[in-house]
Amino acid sequence: MRESTGIEEQAGLTELSEEAGMAEMRELHVYDCALMGAFPMRLILATMLVAGRLLATLMAAPSAQAEPETCPPICDQIPATAWISTHAVPLNSQYRWPAMAGAAVAVTRATPRFGFEQVCATPAFPHDSRDWAVAGRVTVVHPDGQWQLQAQVLHWRGDTARGGQIAASVFGTAVAALRACQLGAPLQSPSVTDDEPTRMAAVISGPVIMHTYLVAHVSSSTISELTLWSSGPPQVPWPTVADSAVLDALTAPLCEAYIGSPP
């Protein structure tokens, strides 16, 4: 079983994530999706003065048209452009899923756990690396027998080399935990249907039927999740949809949202 491997990876992530978190606490939040360089004090004061005047101007005059959110400058929350398109989400023709950016809420004071972890009763780890991530979540709840939805985007700020390693390790740990689903939920049976180094699709059968997709976009230190499930036999049949199409739809927005991160 790979449960021990997942735990070892998680333990390794703890030190890495703590270092990343402490480094970010020491940064002024002039974040450009990279480590901030050192600036002379005069330049900092001049920049603050100009920024203050610019802010006052922007507050006084309404914007004609808002620019799409990207990182930078929007790096302390999930950019609106990072979410999967509603039209690419399975069952959209039946459920008319909401626009993800408009329905997303920030995940704070809680670990942004993946949807399968609740179904599989995956144990929580102390000092989870995801605690250091900027995260947003969309949840659509329906009655039993109807498909429900969870979408999440997690982003680690700072140096993308280090953040990318964290994203890749969290992804690997998640895949191992999903494969070990029956350790916590014997009645649930996982099956990985697309197994790639940084992309995964799986079906979990049992009392809860679940389809889950997970992408680690290492070059932007970001993970995107899409999970749909039905508690009890679903009244709407699952459509024929290629795993790769959904995974591609999760990946593409990250390249646009996090400027400077190659596909």
Question: Language-model segments: what does each one mean?
Answer:
Residues 66-137, 259, 263:
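N-terminal "mature-domain start" segment
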Residues 133-165:
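A short acidic-to-branched-hydrophobic micro-motif
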Residues 10, 29-31:
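Low-complexity, intrinsically disordered or signal/transmembrane-proximal segments
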Residues 185-263:
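A short, solvent-exposed beta-edge/loop patch
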Residues 1, 22-25, 36:
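Methionine residue identity
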